[in-house]
């Protein structure tokens, strides 16, 4: 098999591969131009310049010209100023989901919220509304919808006043999809939505279980389902038709069913490769090398939408295809069955980072992937037939129930290791080392190839080891949206003051626990509740059932409270009528600074505290009640005189926190303040008892 470095002269597959890599890397670099993440594509660029340079000037130019071209365009788009104000915008819809769609006017892309939208990709609309920068409530360690949109090139959102359709696509599948799903109970509906339409409703039990055990990406992989369906059709047709006839029939089926997978990059890749098969059959030309076809498919998708370069599905899908291509020579001397098994193991190895779910590495996820993949094919095929004909309610309900019960059983035996999330640089290093190892292996430099393999293992293993845990001291104001959760850590002693709480999802499972694992904390010595408000302690039951919590404290009588070397003093010793007046106000002398955590204590409590404690000061003040004007009176702020105030608050919250009056007061007093809705989790940390830096 011809590889890039073995190509004599400038073969067409080598040419396309270098052009594709240059375009994709250039687009990523331009988009990340003003961020620290530019270091990742920068390192790849340096290595590829070296490789291309070693091959000769032509290779260097073929890589550099597309790179610079792509970098220039994406850089300009990234630097475009944000639009604001009331506007009338026309554009084409390029993506639709259950409750929003993305529209492009040719230069900019806009997010538009629309409850239960039935719009289709390809519709052209005219929208009147107020344009502003993207702004969504974000949570620590949880999926960032805003980051996802920005990777798609979306920087603005439109608060719609009116929408007028200019052109509507004749085939209206979205409406049919909704009508079809309404025939089923919620559990079956969620399963069909996942396996056929690749939409993940995390409130659905099946979806949540699949995510927990680590096989959600496979079950929702529409490209995999699409390819599996076509492979099944290919097998059936091969019994009746000749090879070339089979390819044409399968391609017709692929074209017929692709509307079900619009917006799914994996499905597009499969369709393009199938179209190549038909082209070679009809033109009677010799089939081009796989590398040529794969690179050409990547280029077609890139030019259809350059922002695919930032899509995990695009990068992982083509990265996996290139990996399998270059990795095939490693199994050359094995027998057929051994070769298939080793290729499967190799595939699972490539997908290892995907098996880390919420900071837990799922040991059996590769096995579950192998088990459920055939089921995904069968269920998706039945769902597709049902969608195209009549609803098979009883059959699909039975299959959905079987899958759900299987997932419940497997969840009980699922083995996992709490490693914490893999940092971005670790995942990058893992994949970068894989391709370097393959490159060196093909060159015959097995020594360097082994070093690459060692780097791969270290990139995921070393950051997961809690070697620094005994030497870390930190206070983290965790971004739990509109609520409070504060981690105090002194080496191996960890205390959580409040844990937040929201009604829409399990905050402990999706925010608190993943954050603790990311910090290499696997038990809490104490959970303290400042008071009983749900936004402070609503996640407590879930947290204590899923994570090791040694002690739970909520009573004032337990203070002063000493946990390890940490001593908390409560200053709210007064009797209050409402729940906020009962909130603990805790002081902690730690890391050479005095912290004051005020919970939701109001002005009345603040005034009593400074009256009875005239010498009370603090370096870092957690502002009361999320910046509400019911707290943070002038007298309290003047006496406490903090170096910095921290406001734990959710973005775009319905209460208007922090209140403008409070912000004005802080500015008038010259007090610096930081907000979790703007910065995310705010952490003060030091190692080996070194002095704490700037606050």
Question: How should each PLM-predicted stretch be described?
Answer:
Residues 4, 153-273, 278-282, 568, ...:
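Aromatic-rich juxtamembrane segments at the membrane interface
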Residues 526-528, 532-560, 642:
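Active-site HxH/HxHxD metal-binding segment of metal-dependent hydrolases
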Residues 2-9, 67-217, 509-519, 523, ...:
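Membrane-interface helix/helix-cap signal primarily in integral membrane proteins
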């Amino acid at each position: 098999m011809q590889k890039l470095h073995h190509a004599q002269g400038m073969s067409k597959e080598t040419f396309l591969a270098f052009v594709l890599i240059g375009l994709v890397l250039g687009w990523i670099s331009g988009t990340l131009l003003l961020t620290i993440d530019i270091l990742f594509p920068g390192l790849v660029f340096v290595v590829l310049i070296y490789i291309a340079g070693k091959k000769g000037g032509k290779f260097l130019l073929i890589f550099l010209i597309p790179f610079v071209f792509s970098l220039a365009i994406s850089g300009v788009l990234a630097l475009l100023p944000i639009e604001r104000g009331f506007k009338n915008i026309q554009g084409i819809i390029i993506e639709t989901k259950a409750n929003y769609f993305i529209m492009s006017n040719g230069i900019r892309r806009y997010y538009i919220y629309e409850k239960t939208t039935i719009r289709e990709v390809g519709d052209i609309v005219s929208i009147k509304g107020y344009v502003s920068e993207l702004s969504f409530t974000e949570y620590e360690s949880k999926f960032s919808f805003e980051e996802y949109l920005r990777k798609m090139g979306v920087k603005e959102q439109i608060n719609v006043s009116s929408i007028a359709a200019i052109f509507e696509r004749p085939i209206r599948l979205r409406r049919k999809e909704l009508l079809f799903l309404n025939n089923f109970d919620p559990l079956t509906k969620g399963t069909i939505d996942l396996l056929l339409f690749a939409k993940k409703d995390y409130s659905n039990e099946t979806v949540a279980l699949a995510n927990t055990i680590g096989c959600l990406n496979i079950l929702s992989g529409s490209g995999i389902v699409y390819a599996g369906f076509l492979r099944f059709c290919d097998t059936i047709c091969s019994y009746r038709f000749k090879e070339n006839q089979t390819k044409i029939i399968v391609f017709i089926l692929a074209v017929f069913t692709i509307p079900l997978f619009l917006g799914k990059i994996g499905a597009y890749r499969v369709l393009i490769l199938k179209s190549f098969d038909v082209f070679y059959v009809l033109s009677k030309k010799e089939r081009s090398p796989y590398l040529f076809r794969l690179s050409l498919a990547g280029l077609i998708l890139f030019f259809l939408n350059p922002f695919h370069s930032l899509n995990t599905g695009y990068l992982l899908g083509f990265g996996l295809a290139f990996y399998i291509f270059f990795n095939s020579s490693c199994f050359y001397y094995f027998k057929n069955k051994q070769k298939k098994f080793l290729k499967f193991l190799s595939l699972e190895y490539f997908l290892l980072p995907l098996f880390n779910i919420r900071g837990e590495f799922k040991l059996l996820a590769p096995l579950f992937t192998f088990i459920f993949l055939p089921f995904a094919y069968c269920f998706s095929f039945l769902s597709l037939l049902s969608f195209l004909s009549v609803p098979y309610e009883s059959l699909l309900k039975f299959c959905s129930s079987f899958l759900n019960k299987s997932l419940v059983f497997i969840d009980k035996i699922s083995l996992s290791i709490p490693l914490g999330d893999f940092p971005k640089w670790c995942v990058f290093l893992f994949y970068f080392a894989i391709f370097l190892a393959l490159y060196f292996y093909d060159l015959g430099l097995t020594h360097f190839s082994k070093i690459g393999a060692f780097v791969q293992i270290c990139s995921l293993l070393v950051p997961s080891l809690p070697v620094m845990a005994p030497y870390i001291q930190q206070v983290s104001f965790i971004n739990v949206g509109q609520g409070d959760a504060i981690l105090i850590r002194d080496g191996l002693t960890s205390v959580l003051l409040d844990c937040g709480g929201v009604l829409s999802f399990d905050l402990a499972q999706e925010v608190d626990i993943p954050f603790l694992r990311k910090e290499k904390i696997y038990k809490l010595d104490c959970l303290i509740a400042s008071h009983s408000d749900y936004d402070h302690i609503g996640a407590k039951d879930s947290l204590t059932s899923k994570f090791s919590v040694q002690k739970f404290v909520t009573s004032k009588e337990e203070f002063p409270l000493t946990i390890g070397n940490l001593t908390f003093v409560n200053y709210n010793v007064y009797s209050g009528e409402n729940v906020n007046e009962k909130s603990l106000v805790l002081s902690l002398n730690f890391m050479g600074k005095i912290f004051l955590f005020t919970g939701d204590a109001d002005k009345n409590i603040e005034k009593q505290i400074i009256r009875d404690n005239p010498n009370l000061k603090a370096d870092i003040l957690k502002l009361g009640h999320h910046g509400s004007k019911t707290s943070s009176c002038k007298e309290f702020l003047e006496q406490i005189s903090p170096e910095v105030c921290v406001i734990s608050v959710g973005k775009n919250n319905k209460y208007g926190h922090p209140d403008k009056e409070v912000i004005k007061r802080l500015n008038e007093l010259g007090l610096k303040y930081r907000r979790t809705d703007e910065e995310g989790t705010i952490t003060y940390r030091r190692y080996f008892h070194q002095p704490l830096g700037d606050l």
